[in-house]
Amino acid sequence: MVSGEFASMKSLHGMVPHLTPMPIAWGTYDSDPNIHFFLCAFVDMTEDIPDPQALGKGLAELHMKGHSPNGKYGFSVPTLQGTIPQYTEWSDSWEEFFTNSIKKVFEAELKSQGSDPEILALEEAIITKVIPRLLRPLETGGRKIEPRLIHGDIWDGNVSTNIATNFPVIFDATCIYAHNECKSPFIKICAIDS
């Protein structure tokens, strides 16, 4: 699903071009339909993580500018965290979006590991008790969260420093419009177990 990475990087580049390589194209090899490519502008980078203050400032700028185009949570195309599909369907509330994302993690766990009564009980508790208690108050009583574009997979392997500018660079994105402090940790849970 290279199209998801291309759309993610295009969205990021539209908001913070100084923080991302410019995406150019994506496609599938004519000679082998199982091989795909993503092409972006070359950025000569260090092997070190960027200055935390500069990276934080760049991500804050992204979250300030990255308004959802339809006011909803989700993303316009499917994206992947490695080989794991990320939930991207449009949702009206953060609670709804996050709940559906967690359900997808549990579905993947069930498919991968089979049925387990403890996991099923944990899923029930998280879906019916934990998420509503933690997230519902963020969007009730006059409070509102505006969905913001997030990278979706920020870690030290997806950030670097541009040698020419000394500015941070972010890449390998799996974007969603989400709570601006979300880092898609629910996908990481599934990825660790796979």
Regions found by a protein language model. Give the residues of each.
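ATP-binding pocket architecture of kinase catalytic cores
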Residues: 1-96, 100
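Hydrophobic "anchor" residues on beta-strands that sit immediately upstream
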Residues: 21, 37, 147-149, 168
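An alpha-helical support segment within catalytic cores of ATP-dependent transferases
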Residues: 28-32, 67-151, 162-165
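Activation segment
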Residues: 29, 45, 168, 174-176
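Short, glycine/charged-enriched secondary-structure capping and boundary segments
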Residues: 53-55, 165-166, 183-186
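Active-site activation/catalytic loop segments of kinase-like enzymes and analogous catalytic loops
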Residues: 108, 175-194
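Hydrophobic HxD+1 residue recognition
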Residues: 154
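Hydrophobic residue at the +6 position relative to the catalytic HRD Asp in the kinase catalytic loop
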Residues: 157-159
